[in-house]
Amino acid sequence: MGNDADAAVHRRFREARDYLLHNREDYATAYANFEWPRFTEFNWALDWFDQIAADPANESRYALWIVEEDGSQGRWTFPELSRRSSQVANWLRQRGVRRGDRLILMLGNQVELWETILAAAKLGAVIIPASTLLGPADLRDRVDRGDARHVVIRSADTEKFAEVPGDYTRIAVGEPVSGWHSFAAAYSADAAFSPDGPTGADDPLLLYFTSGTTAKPKLVQHTHVSYPVGHLSTMYWLGLEPGDVHLNISSPGWAKHAWSNVFAPWNAEATVFLYNYTRFDADALMAQLDRCGVTSFCAPPTVWRMLIQADLSALRKPPTKVVGAGEPLNPEVIEQVRKSWGVTIRDGFGQTETSVQIANTPGQPVKPGSMGRAVPGFRVVLLDPVSGEPSSEGEICLDLTHRPVGLMAGYADDDERTATAFAGGYYHTGDVGSIDENGYITYVGRTDDVFKASDYRISPFELESVLLEHPAVAEAAVVPSPDPIRLAVPKAYVVLAAGHEPSGETAESILRFCRQNLAPYKRIRRLQFADLPKTISGKIRRVELRGRENEAGERRQQGEYREEDFPGLKS
């Protein structure tokens, strides 16, 4: 594109962004009138990031701020990251990285991660984000199925690739490693970058290996618009504005990291703030929030649950924008934070395959237990699983007659799965929800997690929410357990909070609490104290727990408590 065309693309993106900023607390107007900017050619790193970096208003504004556990820190302005990423892009090009090449990026929260994301985008390369927790077997899968031609990793992780065959460029960040290119050499490259041609808006940019809860990871393909432009919806949910300092607790390699540590905050011209720690410490985290003036905070339910175990009042200057993501938050957590900080955690819902679809947006009433309403740019429909017709409860789907920009291109390795996901004119999320007369959607569960007990439909999430209100319960997962009379009954796997013993007395207390707070047909009738199996990204693998129950059949498992063990429960 020429200069005039480049300027027009930037202007259209900015107009859409500014419309959402202007109507940040006017949901009705934003939802009714927002229109996605749609492009034929678009490169977010060049057409947006480099352009805002050149804006005099951002000359001294920090794009990235990383604080280490020992108190050391690094801060980089928008112009600095623009220049450094162009150097990295030129250097990667010299190492053979070409448009369309797939590049595994496996780094921690360090500046080189963001530089490489921007550099790869400028080059038109396809990024395969990878967690530093992955081992050789997972990495072989990514190299093979991902057809990776280049890898950029920490020097400390190079040994993992000794067991990963393949003809790929090896680049190490950190100490020099024999046989690997040193990333540090990139900073000697020219800072003036020119692309080798235009970037198609639908060209691939990201390839995510999802941490599926039921099967082998899927390859979710995103384009140069589906995440960069699509995350305007995430920016709207977070409520970010220029000048905000945003902390999102998420590990590199997973989609949520790109959501809230790259695209959404930089779309808003906000600062991405990171606090690196080896072990979570609620008091230390709150001290950093205070010291660094964090204005916006996003965390998964596990972190929120650990935070409420601490003295929340120790935080003198709470963030004014707080959200929860990953899995729906339980109402009792939201209430405790509201009482201590005077702000309401706003839930949202999205997937690796999408940007945020449903959310409690700024300035709007929050319905306890609800994920919120469809965000601007998304037309959400709940489809009955039997009739396929719109219903007040059903699978959460996106209407493709108004296809949102923030939706994947498809599954790169599976045309059949892609066709299934986009069947019938809808994108099918595989999640079940219910909707009220005001459009608020409440999460019910994955389509394969919801089950029937005595012919009643049971939502694991609803029962888990009640369990988590008990002081002895840190985490919980509910699955169906085979029963000769009811066919299945709800069984809870429980991780205890610190200071509580896995005893019959504790089990009776939890079961009694559930009887007092659940309708009779929803009662948890069996309970077992155990660690919860999780995916590498932290999602509970209920499918594994269901498998244990099916294997045991009606036989009582070791360490399992049943309601009939406690005759006093009926009193």
Where in this protein do the model-derived segments appear?
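Conserved AMP-binding/adenylation subdomain of ANL enzymes
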Residues: 228-245, 252-295, 310-311
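Conserved AMP-binding A3 loop
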Residues: 74-79, 205-229
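Conserved ATP/PPi-binding loop(s) of AMP-dependent carboxylate-activating enzymes
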Residues: 387-420, 458
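Conserved structural elements of the adenylate-forming
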Residues: 82-87, 201, 220-241, 249, ...
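Gly/Ser/Thr-rich phosphate-binding loop
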Residues: 267, 294-298, 308-367, 379, ...
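AMP-binding/adenylate-forming catalytic core of the ANL superfamily
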Residues: 134-135, 141-142, 153-154, 297, ...
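ANL superfamily adenylate-forming
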Residues: 68-71, 156-201, 557-558
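Conserved pre-ATP/AMP-binding loop-to-beta segment of ANL
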Residues: 59-62, 178, 188-209, 215-216, ...
